Curated annotation (Swiss-Prot):
<dbReference type="GO" id="GO:0004165">
    <property type="term" value="F:delta(3)-delta(2)-enoyl-CoA isomerase activity"/>
</dbReference>
<dbReference type="InterPro" id="IPR001753">
    <property type="entry name" value="Enoyl-CoA_hydra/iso"/>
</dbReference>
<keyword id="KW-0276">Fatty acid metabolism</keyword>
<dbReference type="InterPro" id="IPR006108">
    <property type="entry name" value="3HC_DH_C"/>
</dbReference>
<feature type="region of interest" description="3-hydroxyacyl-CoA dehydrogenase">
    <location>
        <begin position="311"/>
        <end position="729"/>
    </location>
</feature>
<feature type="region of interest" description="Enoyl-CoA hydratase/isomerase">
    <location>
        <begin position="1"/>
        <end position="189"/>
    </location>
</feature>
<dbReference type="GO" id="GO:0016509">
    <property type="term" value="F:long-chain-3-hydroxyacyl-CoA dehydrogenase activity"/>
</dbReference>
<comment type="subunit">
    <text>Heterotetramer of two alpha chains (FadB) and two beta chains (FadA).</text>
</comment>
<feature type="binding site">
    <location>
        <position position="296"/>
    </location>
    <ligand>
        <name>substrate</name>
    </ligand>
</feature>
<dbReference type="InterPro" id="IPR012799">
    <property type="entry name" value="FadB"/>
</dbReference>
<protein>
    <recommendedName>
        <fullName>Fatty acid oxidation complex subunit alpha</fullName>
        <ecNumber>4.2.1.17</ecNumber>
        <ecNumber>5.1.2.3</ecNumber>
        <ecNumber>5.3.3.8</ecNumber>
        <ecNumber>1.1.1.35</ecNumber>
    </recommendedName>
</protein>
<feature type="binding site">
    <location>
        <position position="453"/>
    </location>
    <ligand>
        <name>NAD(+)</name>
    </ligand>
</feature>
<keyword id="KW-0511">Multifunctional enzyme</keyword>
<dbReference type="GO" id="GO:0006635">
    <property type="term" value="P:fatty acid beta-oxidation"/>
</dbReference>
<feature type="active site" description="For 3-hydroxyacyl-CoA dehydrogenase activity">
    <location>
        <position position="450"/>
    </location>
</feature>
<dbReference type="InterPro" id="IPR006180">
    <property type="entry name" value="3-OHacyl-CoA_DH_CS"/>
</dbReference>
<keyword id="KW-0456">Lyase</keyword>
Length: 729
């Protein structure tokens, strides 16, 4: 053994060839700060070996290196700029020394080589992959950019266009695509990976392969003519501006850095990468996006822990076809759980099957499946007008009309047709689960399962625990949701549960702004362009359906009369009374016409102004700051109340539910991350300016207490203690 660290070791393999093996104690290899330092020590040992002829890098895990240790990022981002820059210089000196070894090097990569793992691979002369490899640089998705030389080496290896596409979008590619673009040099079966890598090294050692020529382009300026450079970088900047926008500075920073570094050799190019990385690491956007990644891991880990002792349902059923039922049936069948879809109406069944077939055909058009797979999936959805097959199902989700009487009748009837251990769930969006449970003989086998539309796209499923729902029931439904590829978050029961409960105060803020003379177009523009929502409140209401919102608003008002009962007729009432239901009937805040692709396109409609004039004061202008404050304060207050009341268990789950269920702007990280970034005292000052608008603007006591003590909702993070010889970097 030449060297043994905590996460890697170095040993002779054969005849002057050494192997450096990443072998962390856990299930995966991560390139954390300690591993970078250990890698530097191992390379130091290699530099002393006079009989070294070649080096092979590999992993003892199912994945090469999954990336940097993202759990370190938030503390790393708190390190002062100068110190962080110094550490990056040290880390890059390690990869430079790997790249500069006086012998040929090869990385044998399997599973994943992402982020720092990819950058480690880029520092070797040759790269051999297994067919399951995913390789790429996802850093821009976390609000940063490659910091271990990825933005320098990849463009010089692949050419600017392919590298820019991967780096700016934070993409990873499979082994075949990596081979095609030159990111790897060969793809071999897993069992032949090490032998194949040794064979390449022997060829390089024997002079059959010119490893020095292979290495040289990575040390030099990017080979691009002035015209080629102008075209590549202009197109890339245009694409990034269009897709990422101003709220995500990392992609455009990465492109501009690669452009600026193009005319320099490795050392100066790495300095430019360093200078760009450090300021990005100190942005609120980076903290928010890393926070989302960590919260996502937490939520998925919680679901995994919850379901470790239950069997995932093998057969499911959906009550109520149509678009929603068809969407649920498709998602279940697509992920391998056969489903019976029941309705009392043949027309609805046809609609449900058509929806499932349409979604499968889209997969076929994209080349994700072939005709055989399509037929196989569709054959596992069984439409029925009766209860045939219900004696075999493990879980049933009810997705009928949003009416408590109808839902209770359907659930009570279904309970008599299934096994005693079958779990029932309701896809209600607002009706309390404990109320629906009153109709059942086995309420412990019942809970809520709230999907979001469109089912195949929206990642969140709210699992609602009723007063009598058993732990096993919750676990089974969480297991099914996870199997369907969704992110399940368990919440406690109340009108609207979590997501709709916090959405309707936001809509109330919108209605009050309209009442006070604001223009709905400006509100939408501000909430989309400035705050970052995917759609403004007026457009969102049109998409959700004015009739749906009108009904839900009444349910919420009955559930929380002190805050949500209004004493005036609002814009939602006015549009509902005029039969303007939004996209579903072509008239809402806008008029809708189908474009060439059959998608609804919004157009101005003068008639809506007369309707809104009935419920609004004369038009007046509001500042962007006031619009954002008046829209967001009611929502954030309600989010905090849900945490204080135990409706949602943690800030992490609340923020993920908002991001995955409502499209809360990811660069804000969710309501609690936004609160922590803003500071609770500053938020309190802002909210107090609008307390005169009513109870929705009154800040909960728990949040006032946080403001008094200057406490965040997320646990405070200490700056990282960086490992490595920074002075000699």
């Amino acid at each position: 053994m030449l060297y043994k660290g905590d996460t890697l070791y170095l040993d002779w393999l054969e005849d002057g060839i050494a192997e450096l093996v990443f072998d962390a104690p856990g299930s995966v290899n991560k390139l954390d700060t300690a591993t970078v330092a250990s890698l530097g020590e191992a390379i130091g040992v290699l530099e002393q070996q006079s009989d070294l002829k070649g080096l092979l890098l590999r992993s003892n895990k199912a994945a090469f290196i999954v990336g940097a240790d993202i759990t370190e990022f938030l503390s790393l981002f708190l390190v002062p700029e100068e110190q962080l820059s110094q550490w990056l210089h040290f880390a890059n000196s390690v990869f430079n020394r790997l790249e500069d070894l006086p012998v040929p090097t090869i990385a044998a990569a399997n599973g994943y080589a992402l982020g720092g793992g990819c950058e480690c691979v880029l520092a070797t002369d040759y790269r051999l992959a297994t067919p399951d490899l995913r390789i790429g640089l996802p850093e821009t998705k976390l609000g940063i950019m490659p910091g271990f030389g990825g933005s320098v080496r990849m463009p010089r290896m692949l050419g600017a266009d392919s590298a820019l596409e991967i780096i700016a979008a934070g993409k990873d590619v499979g082994a075949d695509q990596a081979l095609k673009i030159g990111l790897v040099d060969g793809v071999v079966k897993a069992e032949k990976l090490v032998e194949g890598a040794k064979a390449v090294l022997r060829q390089a050692i024997n002079g059959d392969l010119d490893w020095k020529a292979k290495r040289q382009p990575k040390l030099e300026p990017l080979k691009l003519s002035k015209i080629e450079a102008t075209m590549s970088f202009t197109i890339a900047k245009g694409m990034v501006a269009q897709t990422a926008g101003k709220h995500y500075p990392a992609p455009i920073t990465a492109v501009k850095t690669i452009e600026a570094a193009a005319r320099f050799g490795r050392e100066e190019a790495l300095n430019l990468e360093n200078k760009s990385f450090v300021p990005l690491a100190h942005t609120n956007e980076a903290r928010a996006l890393v926070g989302i990644f960590l919260n996502d891991q937490y939520v998925k880990g919680k679901a995994k822990k919850l379901t470790k002792d239950v069997e995932t349902p093998k057969q499911a059923a959906v009550l109520g076809a149509g678009i929603m039922g068809g969407g649920i049936a498709y998602q279940s069948a697509w992920k391998g759980v056969p489903v019976v879809m029941k309705d009392i109406n043949d027309k609805s069944l046809t609609l449900g099957m058509t929806e499932a077939a349409k979604l499968l055909n889209k997969q076929l058009e994209r080349g994700k499946i072939d005709g055989l797979k399509l037929a196989g999936v569709i054959s596992t959805i069984h439409p029925t007008l009766d209860y045939a097959g219900f004696d075999r199902v493990d879980v049933v989700v009810e997705a009928v009309v949003e009416n408590p009487k109808v839902k209770k009748a359907v659930l009570a009837e279904t309970e008599q047709k299934v096994r005693p251990d079958t779990v029932l769930a309701s896809n209600t969006s607002t009706i309390p689960i404990s109320e629906l449970a009153n109709a059942l003989e086995r309420p412990e086998n019942f809970c809520g399962m709230h999907f979001f539309n469109p089912v195949h796209r929206m990642p969140l499923v709210e699992i609602i625990r009723g007063e009598k729902s058993s732990d096993e029931t919750i676990a089974k439904v969480v297991a099914w949701a996870s199997k369907m590829g969704k992110t399940p978050i368990v919440v406690n029961d109340c009108p609207g549960f979590f997501v709709n409960r916090v959405l309707f105060p936001y809509f109330a803020g919108f209605s009050q702004l309209l009442r006070d003379g604001a223009d709905f177009r400006k509100i939408d523009k501000v909430m989309e362009k400035q705050f970052g929502w995917p759609m403004g409140p007026a457009y969102l209401l049109d998409v959700v359906g004015i009739d749906t919102a009108h009904h839900a608003q009444a349910v919420m008002a009955a559930g929380f009369p002190q805050r949500m009962q209004k004493d005036y007729r609002d814009a939602i009432d006015a549009l509902f009374d005029a039969n303007r239901f939004g996209q579903k009937n072509g008239l809402g805040f806008w008029r809708y016409k189908e474009d060439s692709k059959g998608k609804p396109k919004k157009e101005e409609d003068a008639a809506v102004e007369d309707l809104l004039a009935e419920v609004s004061q004369p038009k007046r202008d509001f500042s962007e700051e006031e619009i954002i404050a008046r829209m967001m304060i009611p929502m954030v207050n309600e989010v905090v109340r849900c945490l204080e009341e135990g409706i949602i268990a943690t800030p992490a789950e609340a923020d993920m539910a908002l991001v995955y269920g409502l499209g809360f702007p990811p660069f804000h990280g969710g309501a609690f991350r936004w609160l922590d970034t803003l500071g609770s005292a500053k938020y309190l000052d802002m909210a107090q300016q609008y307390q005169h608008l009513g109870p929705l603007y009154e800040v909960p006591e728990g949040l006032r207490n946080k403001a008094r003590h200057n406490e965040p909702y997320y646990p405070p993070v200490e700056p990282a203690r960086l490992v490595g010889d920074l002075k000699t970097a």
